[in-house]
Amino acid sequence: MIYSDAGIFLNETKASLVYSRLSKHIRNLGLSGFREYCELVASPAGAAARREMLSHLTTNFTRFFRENHHFEHLRDHVLPELLQRARSGGRVRIWSAASSDGQEPYSIALTVLSLMPNVADYDFKILATDIDPKILAIARAGAYDESALETVSPAMRKQWFSEVEVQGRRKFQVDDRVKRLITYNELNLMAQWPFKGKFDVIFCRNVVIYFDEPTQMKIWQRFAGLLPEGGHLYIGHSERVSGEAKHVFDNIGITTYRYTTKGLGRKA
């Protein structure tokens, strides 16, 4: 069911993960155990329960500037050319394909703003998508506990965050100047993608690892179709591009790839 809905492959080795993420949820529903829960999500009236199940199973650990080498590479080797294009009237698009609670796309936006504070005046957009509508609501709100900002520099925190109170709790709110660069949309990576144009950069980190090998290969190939020559793909630390997509992605750094049609003639 999870596989057909979202491409997530859960074999016997993932049993402890499933138990840890669902057991409390099942108790909160007042159900007797996993058998009754499975009957619920498999029933014709179980669509909402299946969405809840996906939410619990796909919520991943995230933090600002996680795997910071990606943001350093973006800042030093990718953005200078893209920002020059934007200044010249060109279009720039970045996709955070599994954005979770927003810390990844906000990290991208903060990296961009560190180089070009007035980037919102140009045609420079970041799309952030996730399968979970609840986690997207958190992302859009952009209010985080102080502990989440441990990897944000003091200068960046001072410039782009403000202290607020949310339901009696102390939070740090992302500045609207950061938010306006990002559009959040719900998207299942296994479904049809509604995009008309290409992306200059795609971040898809620590998600494809949950797919089986055939599904992973399809996802890499679909990403390839959305990148222009020289476009960049950043993936998770345990992930590797596989299948036919290996012929069009050059590994240029730690889990960092550049799309190039020059590799089309290479043998596997």
Swiss-Prot record:
S-adenosyl-L-methionine binds at residues 60, 62, 66, 104, 130, 188-189, 205-206. It catalyses: L-glutamyl-[protein] + S-adenosyl-L-methionine = [protein]-L-glutamate 5-O-methyl ester + S-adenosyl-L-homocysteine. It comes from the Bacteria. InterPro entries: Bact_Chemotaxis_MeTrfase, Chemotaxis_MeTrfase_CheR, CheR_C, CheR_MeTrfase, CheR_N, CheR_N_sf, SAM-dependent_MTases_sf. One of its GO terms (molecular function) is protein-glutamate O-methyltransferase activity. Its EC number is 2.1.1.80. Signal peptide: none annotated. Methylation of the membrane-bound methyl-accepting chemotaxis proteins (MCP) to form gamma-glutamyl methyl ester residues in MCP. This is Probable chemotaxis protein methyltransferase. It comes from Rhizobium etli (strain ATCC 51251 / DSM 11541 / JCM 21823 / NBRC 15573 / CFN 42). The lineage of its organism: Bacteria, Pseudomonadati, Pseudomonadota, Alphaproteobacteria, Hyphomicrobiales.
